[in-house]
Amino acid sequence: MATKWGICSAGKISNDFVVALSTLPAVDHQVVAIAARDLEKAKNFAQNHNIPKAYGSYEELAKDPDIDVIYVGAIHPVHRDVVLMCLQNGKNILCEKPLAMNAAQVQELIATARKFNVFLMEAFWSRFFPVYEEIRALLSQKAIGDVKFIRAEFGVEIYKVPRAVEKELGGGALLDIGCYCVQFVTMVFNGERPESVTAKGFLHETGVDESMSLILQYSGKRQAVLSSTIMATLPNQAAICGTKGIIQIPSDMWSPTSIIVNGKERKFDIPHTTKPMNFSNGTGMSYEAEHVRQCLLKGLKESPIMSLADSEMVASIMDEALQQLGVTYP
């Protein structure tokens, strides 16, 4: 039986997610409905991707009995309300990062998912890439000894994009792209809470963070330094440094196709498509989609790889950082 997907929002990320699904066997994954707040947009999206049903409201999607799981690709300020409504209608959910605007909202969504006994996962697609699987394997084998230091950065010049700077649209570097660095550290340190979070950065004229660096201090004198910006393109690398070696992601740390372990590089292929995509390596979203399918087949209510506890931890670290910079959202 195929996993039947409903798609919430007809934006760029939803396009790439549906294209990524098309690289998987059609006997396993089917998109049965798309919803947008503009029915015409939904109809156009449906036509482009051969989706049978198009809705002009998210509520209709939440109530559709044919759907097994909903992918929420809407902008982050609406995540809480949309996910809440879908969960209350008994729908399993894969929601784009950040899961919500703050840790309190994340906790509310987790509690609701448990109350209605449905699956919920934050779509940190990075964690399901072969490179990330390899990193987890290397860490569990203690291949680089004890981890002492982590560095990660994600910066792209998107300050002219309204979504990246407008407060009402959930703009700012940390929530949009810096979150990938926070989840990276959270994965490496197995969801451990840092002993301290120190944030330094600059605010945009709109009041969101345009550039930010975080220092996270962990027990046992372990440290992580994370940087994110919407003002310039960074090398976008990551490194995990241990007592016996180093693991490096040379580029695109959020969607990597290669890894360097103690100076030796290994490359990994990702699914190929001829269809137009908006984001680099976007077909890699197929990994998280297949993971969700496997979780549902096993009757799981959360992912063992991207746990709800990790989502809560990432949100609480970002809360602390934004508070230190004086960023508040409506």
Swiss-Prot record:
Gene3D superfamilies the UniProt entry points to: Dihydrodipicolinate Reductase, domain 2 (3.30.360.10), NAD(P)-binding Rossmann-like Domain (3.40.50.720)
SUPFAM superfamilies (alphabetical): Glyceraldehyde-3-phosphate dehydrogenase-like, C-terminal domain, NAD(P)-binding Rossmann-fold domains
Organism in which the protein naturally occurs: Xenopus tropicalis
EC number(s) given by UniProt: 1.3.1.20, 1.1.1.179
Molecular function in Gene Ontology: D-xylose 1-dehydrogenase (NADP+) activity; nucleotide binding; trans-1,2-dihydrobenzene-1,2-diol dehydrogenase activity
Enzyme class: oxidoreductase
Site, May play an important role in catalytic activity: residue positions: Y180
Catalysed reaction, written as an equation: (1R,2R)-1,2-dihydrobenzene-1,2-diol + NADP(+) = catechol + NADPH + H(+); D-xylose + NADP(+) = D-xylono-1,5-lactone + NADPH + H(+)
Family of the protein in this entry: Belongs to the Gfo/Idh/MocA family.
Pfam families: GFO_IDH_MocA, GFO_IDH_MocA_C3
UniProt-annotated site: May play an important role for the adaptation of the alcohol substrate into the binding site, residues: D176
Classification via PANTHER family: OXIDOREDUCTASES, TRANS-1,2-DIHYDROBENZENE-1,2-DIOL DEHYDROGENASE
UniProt keyword list: NADP, Oxidoreductase
Sites annotated May play an important role in coenzyme binding: Y71, H79, K97
Subunit composition and interactions: Homodimer.
The protein's name in its UniProt record: Trans-1,2-dihydrobenzene-1,2-diol dehydrogenase
